[in-house]
Every structure is written in structure tokens, then in C-alpha cells.
Amino acid sequence: MFITLIFLSYINIVLSNNYWARLNETITLNSNITNDTNNELGIFWNSYNNTYYNNTFNNIAICGKKGIFCECNINYNTSISNTSISNTSIYNVTNNCSLTIFLYDDNIFKTYQLVYQNYKINYTINLLLPVTSPNITYNCTNSLITCEKNDGTNTNMFLSINNITINHTNQDILTYYWNNSEFNNFTATCMINNTLNSANTTKVINCTNPLLNSYQNYFLENIHTLFYIIIFIVSGLIASIFISIITFLSLRKRKKHVEEIESPPPESNEEEQCQHDDTTSIHEPSPREPLLPKPYSRYQYNTPIYYMRPSTQPLNPFPLPNPCPPPKPCPPPKPCPPPKPCPPPKPCPPPKPCPPPKPCPPPKPCSSPESYSPPKPLPSIPLLPNIPPLSTQNISLIHVDRII
């Protein structure tokens, strides 16, 4: 110790020591100072104060040592307010100038400093707490095991796989990547301990099919979400089928209605046939009647031609037309479908520019007027010699409507 102090004084470094202690425990900070009996040595015990950002050391005791004797003057209030331990002092100095501390409160766990001559030694006292069982997690996709500390101080953590220690640390978290090719189904144990107690956690890890395992975990964690998705899909399918059926029936009914409107009524053919029979019976002559020659075509003059028939020929009565059946009452009109909305008018294209007007050709000279010739007289048609005069005949006019 003496050699260490000489070395520290030479390089000007402060020596630091860490102590772990429980609550209500007494700890002694040993000074280990030796000096000659002829020389007196001054010793100072200080405590670190970090209240209100005032990082300074407060003096606890001032001691003088000569040989093996030590006499101190304690400047710190050593009384304890708790009645159960009121007779116990917080700080005491032994005969060799070592400091004894009773750790009755959390505020006592701090840093203390020993100063003598040109030497400084820091003693840091930490509160030692018991440990609890750690947490162990794993990720099959990354082949990762994680051990995490819950409570406890001054701890050591160990990881064992199949009762074989694989890794250890004194930090709060321990991680380890295992080899997939060696094992995927094993038992992992995380153990944590300190000088007070120890605890462990064991978990069976099965990663034979990491992809399937991850899908199973996702399914179990999101089972309620998948249930709502299935209900939504089934409801959508039922609604789509219902809408399709309604649309099909509506289109079928509309098509049938349009066909009934466009198809002609069955009575129209009979009426047209009846009218056609009447017309032919009136205008077409009987086949027994003799046909007289027609000198000119009907289309030439566009006028009806009448012929005379002698009274010696018997008149053939024309057959009367068949009476038409009474018309059937028309069915009530069916309501028309609502008109479709007209599409919006398309914008008119811009007008094309007119081409420039072409120059007019020069006027042609007028031809000389043709001479007028009088019309030729119509040829005289001789009458038949056997026809008596008009005054002695019973003449009837026949309207001939046949085209020669």
C-alpha cells in the first residue's frame, strides 16, 4: 500500500476503491497508514456532497497520528433521529485512524475521501440489493437469446444451454447468437447472483421451423383482427351477390318491356289485308270483261282513261267487298320508361378558315333563239263501222285503271 501511494503521488493520480454493503450494516474504511513515532501526521476524512450542484467535499474528522496512536476531532453531527438506534453513532474513528460508518440510510451511500500529506484516496460505498429472477427472450429468425436483469446490484449473469455455461457478464443485459446447424430445440437458463442471493429463469426454445413458428405467433397475437377481416369479406360477398341478382331481374324486366313496346299489334295485319282486298275488288276489273285497246299510256298523261261499252253486252255486277270485322279495342298504353339523361354536349371544334373565293369564269355568249314550229295535229281515230250513233246507244262509262 505504501509503494502504491508513493507511485500515485509521483504521477498525481487519486486512488479509488469501491465497496458494496447492505442497509443497516457497519463498514470500516481502513486507512493503512504507517509513520514513524517521531513524526506527527495530519489526517483528514471528508464526504462528497453533490447537493444543489455543489460538488464539494465536507470535512468529517481531523485526526493526528503519531506512531500507533490516533486522536481525532469529529466535526460532523453523528446523532441519529431514529429512536430505535439513537445510541448508535454514524461515524467513528478507530485507533489507527480508520473510519467506521453505520449505513442506516440511503443518503449514507456516497463517496468518502482520505487526505494526508500529498495523498488522496476515494472510497465509494454502494448499496447492495438482492436480485430477482431475470427475463429471458429469444428470436428464432435471428437465432438470438437475450437475458435481462430486473433487480439487484453488483450482479453477475450467466447463460447456460442444456446445462452448459455459454456466456456471462456483469452488465444488465446479456445477448447470445446460437448456431442453427447445431441445435434448434434446447433448454436455455439465465442465472443471476451477487453476494446476497441468486435467481434463475429457464425456458424451452423450439425453433425447428422459424418461419412457421413466427406465423403461429402472429396468428395467435392477431386472432381478433383476423376474425373481423373474415366477417368483412363474407359480408361483402353476400352484398355483391344480392346486388347482382337485383340488377339481373331489373334488366330482364326492362328488356321485356321494350320488346312489348316495339312489337306491332296482331290486328294490324288483318286490317291491312282487308283494306287490300277492298281496293283490289274496286279497282281491278273482272276477267270476263273485254279489254279495249288503250292508245296511250296512263303515265304519259297522268289522267284516267274512260272507254265506252255498248249496251248489247251484259253488265257483270262487281262482287261486294267482304265486311271488315269490327276493330278490337286497343289495350291501354303501357307507361313509357323514364328518359335517359342526355350526355353533356361535346364542345364544337373551332371553325375552319374559309378558302379564298375563286375568280368567276367569263360569261358564255348566248346562243341564237330557235324558231318556233307549230304542234302537229293529232291523228284522227276512225270509228268502227258497226257502232251506232251515240243518240241510239245506252252508254256507260268504264273507268279503266290498267296500264298498257
UniProtKB/Swiss-Prot annotation:
Induction: Expressed in the late phase of the viral replicative cycle. It is a single-pass type I membrane protein. May play an immunosuppressive role by inhibiting lymphocyte proliferation and subsequently facilitating viral replication and generalization of infection. Responsible for viral hemadsorption, which may help viral spread. Increases virus replication in the tick vector at the step of virus uptake or replication in the tick gut. May play a role in the host Golgi reorganization to yield viral factories. May play a role in host cell penetration. One of its GO terms (cellular component) is host cell Golgi apparatus. Keywords: Disulfide bond, Glycoprotein, Host Golgi apparatus, Host membrane, Late protein, Membrane, Receptor, Repeat, Signal, Transmembrane, Transmembrane helix, Virion. Residues 322-363 are annotated as: 7 X 6 AA tandem repeats of [KN]-P-C-P-P-P. This is CD2 homolog.
